[in-house]
From Swiss-Prot:
Pathway the protein contributes to: Carbohydrate metabolism; D-xylose degradation [regulation]
UniProt keyword DNA-binding, yes or no: yes
Top-level division of the source organism's lineage: Bacteria
Role, per record: Transcriptional regulator involved in the regulation of the entire oxidative D-xylose degradation pathway via repression of the corresponding genes.
Name recorded for this polypeptide: Probable D-xylose utilization operon transcriptional repressor
SMART domains: FCD (SM00895), HTH_GNTR (SM00345)
DNA-binding residues: 38-57
Description of what induces expression: Is constitutively expressed at low levels regardless of the presence or absence of D-xylose.
Keyword set, alphabetical order: DNA-binding, Plasmid, Repressor, Transcription, Transcription regulation
Protein's UniProt keywords contain Nucleotidyltransferase: no
Record gene name: gntR
Record-linked PANTHER family: GLUCONATE OPERON TRANSCRIPTIONAL REPRESSOR, TRANSCRIPTIONAL REGULATOR, GNTR FAMILY
Amino acid sequence: MDATSKRLTRTTVASQVRDFIVMEIAQGRLPLGAPVREMEIAAQLGTSQTPVREAFRELAALGLLESRIHVGTRVRQLAEKDLVEAVPIRSALEGIAGRLAANNYHKHAEEVRGSFEAMKEVAEGGDRRVFAAASTTFHRSVVRAAENASLLRAWNALGIEVMTILAMASSDIPLDDAAESHRPIVDALEAGDPELAEHALTHHVAAYLPATAHSNGGVDAAVQAS
């Protein structure tokens, strides 16, 4: 295995560790303020501490974890507030992306439509974490279709997949309905209507997570899906 393959494998494991921790937070098994220890997570998942450390760094950058000298790593107390504050930013960014993507859709139709169909297929499996990844892939395909590098960088910086995992873990909306809620976005893009695409994305994102609150120590998201 060459260096690139080793790096890819480690990155994949780190992403799995990240998703596991996010689910633990979302479902209340790691309440806000709770300590999170590298050795314990590594032992629990049967992996080395290296991918766990990488996952910790990513989640700290997203504001879900915080590390302090002589204290260790904990679930950040303001994680929910940060998520709520990120929603209108994401809504605005994706609205702009929709407007731009509508004019470029003919070049990206296969990717956007393909990711939408893949999301619907994944929904049938009932795995919310897998669905969150598929939903993120769809939204990323729309932002990519905007063909604006600055917009894509800003969108990526929000940690969309983590936001989506948190929302889906705490929501009881059927995944088939969650997938179908993306159809107006696809319809607007296929119609080549910038204003309609902007409205569809802005409304979709703003509606799915208007607020979060404690629920048995976890994160209770609104019932709309990302």
